[in-house]
């Protein structure tokens, strides 16, 4: 039985999961957090499901070895490929995944047209198709795969002309289709909100699922009486690539500097 003071493991293919980590820290400030950025294998969106499953299994084993009381897959593509496999392997371990916010977007739209920005892997998945079948019968959903966005966000330069032009090229067709609600279907994309705000009309809603994931984690921990009640330890970071890259980005995306350890899996 895990202890209340045990940490929560959060993983992503790279730095995108920091957007989810921030929501978890905001809602659950007493929780100690471990973060693995699988930067040596980014982007997951262009990898095969089996490849992603193998990566997630190794990271789950690492979190288990660290004594983590729960694991969050802060990556839509990893959730699609691996969450069912991990739940089968660890039936008693709280696992939280990500999925595009189709349900709240379908409820929020006024035009009846919802746009989705996501990776190719997420948009082509059976899990995403099932979400549309379940929640989007009464709206039109326009999808936009976004190759290249994750890699540019990974550099930490969120104001670059290249990033701005690429994002604009993905957003314009959605607006032209009449979308008044945009789903950010990748955990990297919330870092683009300031850019998006300058590209879309003020009445276009932008929706992501980071806060919902934090709430689900809280529910799972509370149900098992595992919510921490003491002061949290500082978040610990690992990267499967050069740690200096993540260390340089942390002040930009996490608003705090920190040391990053190299993780070879």
From Swiss-Prot:
Keywords: Cell shape, Cell wall biogenesis/degradation, Isomerase, Peptidoglycan synthesis. Gene3D superfamilies: 3.40.50.1860. The lineage of its organism: Bacteria, Pseudomonadati, Pseudomonadota, Gammaproteobacteria, Pseudomonadales. Pathway: Cell wall biogenesis; peptidoglycan biosynthesis. Substrate binds at residues 12-13, 44-45, 76-77, 187-188. One of its GO terms (molecular function) is glutamate racemase activity. Provides the (R)-glutamate required for cell wall biosynthesis. InterPro entries: Asp/Glu/hydantoin_racemase, Asp/Glu_race, Asp/Glu_racemase_AS_1, Asp/Glu_racemase_AS_2, Glu_race. Its EC number is 5.1.1.3. It comes from Pseudomonas putida (strain W619). The active site is at 75 (proton donor/acceptor), 186 (proton donor/acceptor). One of its GO terms (biological process) is cell wall organization. Belongs to the aspartate/glutamate racemases family. It comes from the Bacteria. This is Glutamate racemase. The gene is murI. It catalyses: L-glutamate = D-glutamate.
């Amino acid at each position: 039985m895990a202890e209340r003071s045990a940490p929560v493991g959060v993983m992503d293919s790279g730095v995108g999961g920091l957007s989810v980590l921030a929501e978890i820290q905001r809602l659950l400030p007493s929780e100690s957090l471990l973060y693995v950025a699988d930067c040596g294998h980014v982007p997951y969106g262009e990898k095969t499901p089996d490849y992603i499953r193998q990566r997630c299994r190794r990271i789950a084993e690492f979190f288990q070895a660290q004594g983590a009381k729960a694991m969050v897959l802060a990556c839509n593509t990893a959730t699609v490929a691996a969450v069912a496999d991990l739940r089968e392997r660890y039936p008693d371990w709280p696992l939280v995944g990500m999925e595009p916010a189709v349900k709240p977007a379908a409820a929020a739209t006024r035009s009846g047209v919802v746009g989705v920005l996501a990776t190719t892997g997420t948009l082509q998945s059976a899990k995403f198709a099932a979400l549309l079948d379940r929640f989007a019968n009464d709206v039109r959903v326009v999808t936009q795969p976004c190759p290249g966005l994750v890699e540019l966000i990974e550099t930490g330069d969120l104001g670059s002309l290249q990033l701005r032009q690429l994002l604009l090229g993905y957003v314009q067709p959605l607006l032209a289709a009449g979308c008044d609600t945009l789903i950010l279907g990748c955990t990297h994309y919330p870092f683009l909100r300031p850019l998006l705000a300058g590209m879309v009309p003020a009445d276009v809603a932008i929706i992501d699922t980071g806060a919902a994931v934090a709430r689900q984690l809280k529910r799972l921990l509370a149900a098992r009486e595992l919510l921490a009640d003491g002061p949290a330890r500082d978040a610990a970071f690992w990267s499967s690539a050069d740690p200096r890259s993540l260390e340089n980005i942390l002040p930009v995306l996490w608003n705090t500097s920190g040391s990053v350890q190299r993780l070879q899996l």
